[in-house]
Amino acid sequence: PKFKSKKNPVRSYTTNCVNGNITLQNAKLELPKAGWIRIKQHRSIDDRYILKGATVSQEADDKYYVSLLYAAEEPEHEIRPVKTAIGLDFSMSELYVDSNGAHADYPHFFRKSQEKLAREQRRLSHCEKGSSRYMKQKKKIARLHAHIVRQRKDYLHKESRKIANFYDLVCIESLNMKEMSQDSRFGTSVHDNGWGMFTDFLSYKLECAGKKLVRIDKWYPSSKICSCCGKLKKELKLEDRIYRCTCGNQMNRDENAAINICREGLRISGVELDTERKIS
């Protein structure tokens, strides 16, 4: 099969499995008309699953990927009793701060590569559009972007796995990431840290383990409520990074919000906890 689009950076086609015309065997894949091709298999497939189709895609960096669609009976996940819970407050600079005071310390893969990307973009601007040199430079930039995406996904998978292993209930805010990404002040940070992707990973990992992700209302004033006395502080500017209350409470603004998010999530779930567990 041939890809039809010349402009779309991600080109793909999908084919259905009919009469066994798609076969996966010993790190080799048989596709209609393409025959047998060698692949790097991401993970092993359970023999009970039924192969339904395949989607072959060519990314902007010229690498080919195939996604296989399988059908299987959805397993019943045993709901585990909640013994441990944590609240996560979204942070522009660190991905999140949790209710135990721990910071994710997100590596900022895109920002670290910005200088190199800008240099390669300048070189591209000096090439004649459509020339072989132009296409070669364009692919080089695409490879850089693909590398950043892989770094980000790897980090977010590991971070979400760590949390899913330790906690039975995870509480977060329902944020409109699309709206935030369009803000000139936050756009780059929102795209860089991948909070939406992180929460998606966290959601399915928790579900598979019989655990739960609770999203609290985005209008809940988690940053303005004192986590010690419960008093609402009406005047709180975005640049105020330390939360100070008349009761004497003084702590990191995001940590204070994370504690409130955790408590609100527990309230919504109807769960009471006497113990806490921290990630070691």
Segments (PLM) and residue ranges:
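Nucleic-acid substrate recognition interfaces
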Residues: 1-280
